[in-house]
Amino acid sequence: EIGVRLVGSEMCIRDRRITGRELRKDTISLPGNVSSQYISALLMIAPVLTNGLTIRLTGDIISRPYINLTLQLMNDFGVRAEWTDDHRLKVEPQAYHSTPFYVESDWSAASYWYQIVALSKEAEVTLPGLFKDSYQGDSQVAGIFRSLGVETIYKDKAVILKKNGKSVERLDYDFINQPDLAQTFVVTCALLNIPFRFSGLQSLKIKETDRMAALITEMRKLGYILHETDGSVLSWEGERCTTEEHPAIDTYEDHRMAMAFAPTCLALPEILINNPQVVSKSYPRYWEDLRQAGFIIKEV
């Protein structure tokens, strides 16, 4: 739509040829319910386009904190990028400027360590490089896990996670602004026997896989029957089925499926994770870090 010439199959990116040329179109419209990765990609190239770019988002906007994170980091590197109203983003032609920058650790990745603490009888974990006043929308993980008995102690450029044992009897939450945390909480709540209703999950269908369908399928292997409603809600009201004797979790080429299900070994005799290498997308040291924390991991 902004002028890039694509030749080849629409279904397979490996069969496409992209022809570069000057991109002059300065306005584009796209649905606000697409993955924020598409919006962030357009924002980041916008300053170097001939006429800049105005992005109009239609309908409901999901994952707004991820968009705001992109805007904040662009501003940190000298580019003015901003909302002009609730559904419109504008970036003028301008140049990025290099600047010293401390890269914060990933709160999304931290969620799996919160999960480990929540599923443990006693645990304390220190995670370096995380800030209380974080740009990242997924830093809300600390507040949500407080409901599941995990306390967060903020230090200088680090957090300490401790089990306090005080969990809610039920958890209802709208993940519209933190969809990448949903898998972690689905698995954690079920294993803690905490019924839940999680809404705002419509973007899970357009991630690395249809995460809603994947969660329903894989949680059934562990003996939990989840229900999807309106394409945006996952719920569990305590309904159980027979647990597979040797559950093997399929990861669907999705890094978050592997990392959300691995900690289930704390509540089950064992768990098998198929295609564990998928974690390389966002957390390549995940398995090594688990080993250092005392988990026994074997390749089969």
Describe each region flagged by the PLM:
Residues 1-13:
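Single conserved hydrophobic/aromatic residue that forms the stacking wall/gate
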Residues 19-62, 91-133, 162-206, 237-281, ...:
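Structural motif
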Residues 66-70, 94, 102, 115-116, ...:
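Short acidic, glycine/serine/threonine-rich loops at helix termini
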Residues 78-89, 123-130, 149-161, 195-196, ...:
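Flexible, glycine/charged-enriched surface loops at secondary-structure junctions
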Residues 134-151:
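Conserved loop->alpha-helix
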